[in-house]
Design a protein with these regions (language model features):
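Basic, amphipathic DNA-recognition helix from helix-turn-helix-like DNA-binding domains
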Residues: 1-18
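Positively charged, aromatic-enriched patches within helix-turn-helix-type DNA-binding elements
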Residues: 30-42, 46-100, 105-106
Length: 117
């Protein structure tokens, strides 16, 4: 029985997204920096998951608003995305680095990737 379980577990590894030390487990709705679990609000988690699922791609504020908040921006304040990104950065970046995992792409939007040194 144990051998069967091991075979099944190896066949179906748990889904996860990784960027540097940052790991997100969508099934468990958990985020870790190294071995430390990070506590996020629902919107922060949704935003981080969206960024990590689209790793390396530039996502516009409008696209993020529509996907995460489900609106085209008409009922949400302009800087909602920026404020949520800043809160998220403070939680996931070492010392709240401004351009760590989440990077601004001037005039276009945001993307997540390895930290720029």
């Amino acid at each position: 029985l144990m051998k069967r379980l091991e075979v099944v577990l190896k066949r179906n590894p748990e889904e996860r997204y990784m960027v540097g030390e940052l790991t997100l487990y969508p099934d468990r709705k958990q985020v870790f920096t190294g071995k430390t679990e990070i506590s996020l609000t629902a919107k922060e988690y949704q935003l981080l998951e969206y960024l990590m699922r689209n790793q390396g791609q530039v996502l516009t504020k409008e696209n993020i608003l529509e996907t995460i908040w489900g609106v085209d921006g008409q009922f949400v304040v302009d800087n909602t995305v920026s404020v949520t990104i800043n809160r998220l950065r403070r939680k996931i970046e070492p010392d709240g680095e401004r351009q760590g995992y989440i990077q601004n792409v001037f005039g276009l939007g945001y993307r997540i990737g390895e930290k720029e040194r």
